[in-house]
Amino acid sequence: MSVNYMRLLCLMACCFSVCLAYRPSGNSYRSGGYGEYIKPVETAEAQAAALTNAAGAAASSAKLDGADWYALNRYGWEQGKPLLVKPYGPLDNLYAAALPPRAFVAEIDPVFKRNSYGGAYGERTVTLNTGSKLAVSAA
């Protein structure tokens, strides 16, 4: 995610929390005032949760984008379970946004890091570790 998308997401989260915090009462026969009491603690918690989720999605997307998808998919086929629906390409930013709230990609095994040389002619062979995996931890 670029900085502009992150700013837009934070602005939308703040506007959404303000809209939810101020709700006029629907019943005109009520003895209270026009609006209900706004609890600043709940509003601040909602804003913090939205910002944490956005930061988690950005961190997950950045870590997942640095993986060597060909080696990861080949490892899945060797184990008998294909890990990706498509045999090519990284998952987009929507995958990171679809993760559970406050979920982060904790660790990507170094064996699946993307090759800095591009992997064309003279690609080095990768010895895959049978214990290698993508780990996602929800807080």
Swiss-Prot record:
Pfam families: Chorion_S16 (PF05836). Keywords: Secreted, Signal. Residues 1-21 form the signal peptide. The keyword DNA damage does not apply. It is found in: Secreted. Coiled coil: none annotated. It comes from the Eukaryota. Its main location: secreted. The keyword Signal applies. One of its GO terms (biological process) is dorsal appendage formation. One of its GO terms (cellular component) is extracellular region. Belongs to the chorion protein S16 family. Chorion membrane (egg shell) protein; plays a role in protecting the egg from the environment. This is Chorion protein S16.
